[in-house]
Curated annotation (Swiss-Prot):
Catalytic activity reported: L-methionyl-tRNA(fMet) + (6R)-10-formyltetrahydrofolate = N-formyl-L-methionyl-tRNA(fMet) + (6S)-5,6,7,8-tetrahydrofolate + H(+)
GO CC field: cytosol
HAMAP family in alphabetical order: Formyl_trans
Coiled-coil features, chain-numbered ranges: none
Organism: Burkholderia mallei (strain ATCC 23344)
GO molecular function: methionyl-tRNA formyltransferase activity
Protein name from the UniProt record: Methionyl-tRNA formyltransferase
Keyword Cell cycle listed: no
Length: 327
């Protein structure tokens, strides 16, 4: 089936690529794709195209990669060229998903149906850069995807559609990301079909109550504070997979802790102390309960199940991970 609604798409990572693929496969014309410039990545730090760029190039879509869209910003010449291109490209709506660049008011007002953002949370909870991580870290039972009519604020626009997704006890950011990407892809196609059919989408202002912000994840957050309850640390480990991982310092070496669950602990063990080692994992005392770590990684090594890790890097009961503030 083909559609007449013309969609400019702006997005960068895999989450966005899933939406672009769904829009394209549904038959909506995509006259232009915006994505961030290629970035160095990997061990060789070679320039890598974004997931959105790779998908668009493989299908012959026009792609622009401006470093900014702000006329008065750091890259005024590039911004002007990109804005001229947007003005010259006939379109009806812009869909934005994890693009990573601020859209000035000029861009927000350009499409006749405005700009629709695909946000990976149930707004107004978890506005901001890391909604998937923060939902898991906080112990939320569910999250979802919200389609929002973009305005000048940070994820403050009116809500158009939402889809709810349960957070499973073993979900990591990686697994939940994939669920939400699929939900967002379905949701945006349904919304575009409705927009084309009716000419407008019903918009509901976000409530003033329940607003929370999902701050960007920093590498420093990887360090586990063993004084916290084990349940909170287990959520932290899941929230920070694949980035930045959980981390603990043992005898001066920083180990990455990739999978863990909370188990009963011992009252006589100081937080951070290894209290048990077995084929099922390494059990570490916490402020409340204990954390059983089932997947570890030593510096320069690979992520390994506990059994394989211990075969090459034995640990001992009584060893103690350094406090987070001393690591």
């Amino acid at each position: 089936m083909t559609h007449s609604l013309r969609v400019i798409f702006a997005g960068t990572p895999e989450f966005a690529a899933a939406a672009l693929a769904a829009i394209h496969e549904a038959g909506f014309p995509v006259p232009l794709v915006l994505t961030q410039p290629d970035r160095p990545a990997g061990r060789g730090m070679k320039l890598q195209a974004s997931a959105v760029k790779r998908y668009a190039f493989e299908r012959g879509m026009a792609v622009a990669q401006p470093p900014s869209l702000r006329r008065a910003g750091k890259y005024p010449a590039e911004a002007v060229a990109a804005l001229d291109l947007l003005h010259a490209t006939p379109h009806d709506v812009m869909v934005v998903a994890a693009y990573g660049l601020l859209l000035p008011q000029e861009v927000l007002e350009l499409p006749r149906h405005g700009c629709i953002n695909i946000h990976a949370s149930l707004l107004p909870r978890w506005r901001g850069a890391a909604p998937i991580h923060r939902a898991i870290e906080a112990g939320d039972a569910e999250t979802g995807v919200t389609l929002m009519q973009m305005d000048a604020g940070l994820d403050t626009g009116a809500m158009l559609h939402e889809a709810r997704v349960a957070i499973a006890p073993d979900d990591t950011t990686a697994t939940l990301h994939d669920k939400l990407a699929a939900a967002g892809a379905r949701l945006i196609v349904d919304a575009l079909v409705e927009l084309e059919r009716t000419g407008a989408l019903a918009a509901t202002p976000q409530p003033a109550d329940g607003v929370t912000y999902a701050e960007k994840i920093g590498k420093h957050e990887a360090a586990l504070d063993w004084r916290k309850p084990a349940a909170a640390l287990a959520r932290q480990v899941r929230a920070f997979d694949p980035f930045p991982g959980g981390a603990g310092t043992l005898d001066g070496a920083t180990l990455k802790l990739w999978a863990a669950d909370a188990v009963p602990g011992r009252d006589d063990a100081a937080p951070g102390t290894i209290v048990d080692i077995g084929p099922d994992g390494v059990v570490i005392a916490c402020g409340e309960g204990a954390l059983r770590v089932t997947q570890l990684q030593k510096p320069g090594g690979k992520r390994l199940p506990a059994r394989e890790f211990l075969a090459g890097a034995p640990l001992a009961v009584g060893q103690r991970f350094a406090p987070a503030d001393a690591a």
